[in-house]
Amino acid sequence: MLLVDDHAIVREGLKRVLCPKGSDWALTEAETGFQALELLRTSEFDLALVDLSLPGMNGLELIRRIKTEFPAVRVLVLSMHAEEQYALRAFKAGANGYVTKDMAATELVGAVRRVVAGGAYVTASLAESVVRQLNGSAEAPRHALLTDREFDVLRRIAAGQRLTEIGNALHLSVKTVSSHKTRIQDKLQVAGTAELVAYALRNRIDDAFPEQ
């Protein structure tokens, strides 16, 4: 399996959990999405364990690239980000499972086994949330209407980044970022930056999207 995470201490800890002495699993490490794609092009992997907070190429984009170039590779997201903000976006990108880094080791191993075997892994709380939205007993939040790019811009605005900083980080012009901001405000039905930030804070979006 291929583990994609930019923190060495996290990779080492996961290696001890997933590949103890005598394990049948072998683990190859990558620090960035670009490095992961190069490894996938030169070696065969059954599973990619992908963190969402990756430098240069965020986890969602990496998942899409993997599923486009290597459709047979299973993808399990391993993230510090709350599933209620991010799991559905990961599944829409092509992920086969989503777990958080505070999950118990035995549960993580079980999730890996299920995804490698061809199944999907979702937590009970996420499954319940999806069912409640589908049967109408709970409404999807307004920010569910945002594209991944818009969601990223919203998170950055809420974190205090200026439009020029966002443009530099995402390789976009300030005009394009401003257009994204306008569409976000329309979708969230808020009037300006202050209301936009307040909405993000209420919905825990200020730290929900991975850095890039």
Per-region residue spans from a language model:
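Short amphipathic alpha-helix used as the core "switch/output" element in two-component signaling
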Residues: 38, 60-72
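Acidic catalytic/metal-coordinating carboxylates
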Residues: 32, 58-61
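The feature encodes the CheY-like receiver
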Residues: 10, 55
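Short, flexible helix-to-coil linker/hinge segments that flank and couple to helix-turn-helix
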Residues: 85-92, 96-148, 152, 194, ...
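Active-site residues of response regulator receiver
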Residues: 51, 79
